[in-house]
Curated annotation (Swiss-Prot):
It comes from Methanococcus aeolicus (strain ATCC BAA-1280 / DSM 17508 / OCM 812 / Nankai-3). Its EC number is 2.1.1.77. It catalyses: [protein]-L-isoaspartate + S-adenosyl-L-methionine = [protein]-L-isoaspartate alpha-methyl ester + S-adenosyl-L-homocysteine. Its main location: cytoplasm. GO terms for biological process: methylation; protein modification process; protein repair. NCBIfam families: pimt, PRK00312.1, PRK13942.1. This is Protein-L-isoaspartate O-methyltransferase. InterPro entries: PCMT (IPR000682), SAM-dependent_MTases_sf (IPR029063). Keywords: Cytoplasm, Methyltransferase, S-adenosyl-L-methionine, Transferase.
Length: 216
């Protein structure tokens, strides 16, 4: 792992105000991003950009992983649901933050990606991550409720099925929209649903029963 490159990225994110949680900073410096991308892209592992992982999917840019983790206000011991495993990198970062007393449930619709991510996470010792191959727009009621939920693909709206699986006082972060997307922070607070727009983003489409029905 090119630690100096990641240190420079993390320092830049802190200076730009994107990264306030020291636990997120530590996790970014710990997880070897190069392990989650194709070998031919290893030279770009510690460049703050999305990278192609096959099947029309990408590993998110480092700053986007940081922004989502920061917005979720992750705590040690949290149970977290991720929709869109992709490479497994984001799940590994979250797993570092929530620790061995926490748990990450991550759902991936593409079998090949789910299998590869599970293999990589297992190799790196992330025993607190469970990979499920299935329709992420439905969530996973088996392990609900969750302290935090986040999506790595953008749907027409935040699926009610996921909001229902969020604990009272929980937080959910999701990109919403198709060609024009916004990153939305949703909180269940005092019996109300509160939403905040965190800014414009660009994610792959959320495919499934409660998402888009086709690739765009």
């Amino acid at each position: 792992m090119t630690i100096k490159k990641m240190e420079a990225i993390v320092k830049g994110l802190i200076n730009a105000g994107y990264l306030k949680n020291k636990m997120v900073s530590k996790a970014l410096l710990t997880v070897p991003r190069h392990e989650f991308i194709p070998a031919e892209l290893h030279d770009y592992a510690y460049v703050d950009t999305p990278l192609n992982i096959g099947h029309g999917q990408t590993i998110s840019a480092i700053h986007m992983v940081a922004i989502i983790c920061d917005a979720l206000d992750l705590k040690e011991g949290d149970k977290v649901l991720e929709i869109g495993t992709g490479s497994g990198y984001h799940a590994a970062v979250v797993a570092e933050i929530v620790g061995k007393n926490g748990q990450v449930i991550t759902i991936e619709r593409i079998p090949e990606l789910a299998e590869k991510a599970e293999s990589t996470l297992k190799k790196l010792g992330y025993t607190n991550v469970k990979v499920i191959c299935g329709n992420g727009t439905l969530g996973s009621s088996e392990f609900a409720p969750y302290d935090k939920i986040y999506l790595t693909a953008s749907g027409p709206d935040i699926p009610n099925s996921l909001i229902e699986q969020l604990k009272k006082g929980g937080k959910l972060v999701a990109p919403v929209g198709l060609y024009i997307q916004d990153l939305i922070l949703l909180e269940k607070k005092n019996g109300n649903i509160i939403k905040k727009n965190l800014g414009a983003v660009a994610f792959v489409p959320l495919i499934g029963k409660n998402g888009w029905h086709n690739e765009y």
